[in-house]
Structure formats: C-alpha cells, structure tokens
UniProtKB/Swiss-Prot annotation:
Gene3D superfamilies: TolB, C-terminal domain. It is found in: Vacuole. Glycans are attached at N37, N79. GO terms for molecular function: strictosidine synthase activity. Catalyzes the stereospecific condensation of tryptamine with secologanin to form strictosidine, the key intermediate of indole alkaloid biosynthesis. It holds the Pfam family Str_synth. It comes from the Eukaryota. GO terms for cellular component: plant-type cell wall; vacuole. Keywords: Alkaloid metabolism, Glycoprotein, Hydrolase, Signal, Vacuole. Pathway: Alkaloid biosynthesis; 3alpha(S)-strictosidine biosynthesis; 3alpha(S)-strictosidine from secologanin and tryptamine: step 1/1. It comes from Arabidopsis thaliana (Mouse-ear cress). This is Protein STRICTOSIDINE SYNTHASE-LIKE 11. It catalyses: 3alpha(S)-strictosidine + H2O = secologanin + tryptamine.
Length: 329
C-alpha cells in the first residue's frame, strides 16, 4: 500500500512540474516554489500585518512567505522537523516523527497560529514562531488518527477542526477513500476551557471546515461523499446539522471570503486513476454555486487542497505539489 501511495505522489509531482510550462504563460498566475526538498503547501493563513502568508509543508515545517524575501522558516511541529530526516520526506514518510501540518488558522486577537497536524494532533504556535505546542492528540481516550481541516472563529476564538478518518491514518488515505470510510469527525476546541468536544461523527472523509462570516454556522466538507454539511453554532438550530450542498465534487478545504457570506472550495474529480480536473468553486451562504475556475492548466491533474482569497488574489495550495499558486482576480 505504501509503495503504491508513494508512486501516486511521485506521479502527481511530475504532473505538477509538467503543468508549470503552461502556467508561466499566464501573467495573472504566479508560482511560488517551496524551497529545499519540501512539498505540499496545503493550506494558508494570514496574520494581522497583511504581509505574506504562512503555510505548512511536508516534514513538519510551517513556512512564512514574505514578498521581498521569499520563504523563511517560522515554526516546526516537532524537534525533528528541521532535521535531514524530515527534509525531503515525501508525502506521509516519517509523519510520526516529523509531523505533517494540514489545516492552519490564526486567532487574530491573540496572534496564536493553530495547526491540525495530520498525524500528530492539534497544536498551537505562538506569534514568535518556533516549536509548536501540542494541545491534544485524542478525545475521550480515542486518538484522532488523521486530522485535516481547521478554522478559528474570529469572534469567539473557538477552534473548529476535522478528522478525515478515525480508522485510517494519513498513510492509508487511499484506502480510506476506496472503502468509502465514514468514521470522520468534526470537533471544537475552546481555548478558555481547554476542552475538545466532538460535534459530529460518521463523516465520509471530513476535510475542510470554515466558520461563516456572521458566525452562525460552520461548513464541514465530506471529500469522499462529495457533500458539504452545515453545522449550526448559533440560533434556534444550534447544535444541529444539515446538508448544505451536493454540487461540489470531492470538496477539500473551505474558506470564507471576508464578510461577503460566500466561500471558496477546493475541488477535484476523484476518478479511478486519481484526482483530476482541479477547480476553485465559489458558493453562496445558501449553498448555490456562484463561480467555477478550472485550475488544470496551472496544476495539472493533482489534488488542489485550498483556495483562499486575500486582497484580490486567490492563494492556491496542493497536497502533493511543489509550489503554491497565486491567481489575480
């Protein structure tokens, strides 16, 4: 299984490189190759300064990108994350020692950066960076196994995050998808109480999550089921969930678009041979698809993991790709 997974990652990386020839012809699209032997800038976060972005990559590092300087090291999940063992760790190689940051988001009031590490649990990084502090790797005595998406409520500071599966770890992601595993979960962490709570269970590949701009609900994607659910956190429906949309194919990370009420969703078509036709899909607060931007000419047939709008540009991540992309709107 591991050999086939590594082979798939290698193929996806090759496709990502080959597509770069086409993308350089697009003046509105910019590639920001990840330095060294790291890959997979999966998600993005922006601090209060508004200068550059933060992203997690293979081997357990969090990088900060500065427009005039490029990528610099900001933080690491474990002490080993900066070692030669973790430099060049392909896909899920050595995830138990190195870590693999998946979802990331700032608490804009405190400056703390929260990270859902796929293999090692929920972490927090102080505004100065450095070694991440583990908050939790289990709830109720049950290990998370495979964390994925994360968002922070900008008003309350409550952290919402997902687990792709409670049966399979990151090394067995293909098996989780192939068997249509439905043991994913949706959690919240309240920093004021230091307690993790399970909000939803029985999810099929729960990937991205995003708090709405008015703070009334959280969207939770089900990659395997091509479905997005809405979990209410305020109002008469608080504590209940419902289907939000089935119109987005294999949704990964979900990001709110400022105060507009809309969201960007990273989407692919999961075929028998692997992910294909990546796209950025904008949906309204009512679940209506407003816009679809094809990304195949820029990323090839790879798994685009996040589309995050910031100051008139889309920041696009890829789970296995060698670069982050910026698309001007």
């Amino acid at each position: 299984m591991m050999r086939s997974f590594v082979s798939l990652i290698s193929l996806l990386l090759l496709l990502s490189f080959s597509s770069s020839v086409l993308s350089t012809k697009k003046s509105s699209f910019q590639k920001l190759p990840v330095p060294g032997n790291r890959t997979g800038p999966e998600a993005f976060a922006f601090d209060s300064t508004g200068k550059g972005f933060y992203t997690g990559v293979t081997g357990g590092k969090i990088l900060k990108y500065l427009p005039k300087k490029g990528y610099v090291d900001f933080a690491q999940i474990t002490n080993s994350s900066k070692s030669s063992l973790c430099d060049g760790a392909l896909g899920t190689t050595n995830v138990e020692k190195c870590g693999r940051p998946a979802g990331i988001a700032f608490n804009t009031k405190t400056g703390d950066l929260y990270v859902a590490d796929a293999a090692l649990g929920l972490h927090v990084i102080p505004r100065r960076g450095g070694l991440a502090k583990k908050i939790a790797d289990s709830v109720g005595g049950k290990p998370f196994l495979f964390l994925d998406g994360l968002d922070v409520d900008p008003t309350t500071g409550v952290v919402y995050f997902t687990s792709f599966s409670s049966t399979f770890g990151p090394r067995d992601v293909l098996k989780a998808v192939a068997t249509k595993d439905s043991t994913g979960k949706f959690f919240k962490y309240d920093p004021s109480k230091k307690v993790v709570t399970v909000l939803m269970e029985g999810l099929s590949g729960s990937a991205g999550c995003a708090v709405s701009s008015d703070g009334s609900f959280v969207l939770v994607g089900q990659f395997t089921k091509s479905n997005i659910k809405r979990y209410w956190i305020k109002g008469s429906k608080a504590g209940t969930s419902e289907d939000f949309t089935n119109s987005v194919s294999n949704p990964d990370n979900i990001k709110r678009i400022g105060s507009t009420g809309n969201f960007w969703v990273a989407s692919v078509v999961n075929s028998a041979t692997g992910p294909t036709n990546p796209s950025a899909v904008k949906v309204s607060s009512a679940g209506k698809v407003l816009q679809t931007i094809p990304l195949k000419d820029k990323f090839g047939d790879t798994l685009v993991s996040e589309v995050n709008e910031y100051k008139g540009q889309l920041y696009i991540g890829a789970l296995f790709g060698p670069f982050a992309g910026i698309l001007k709107l």
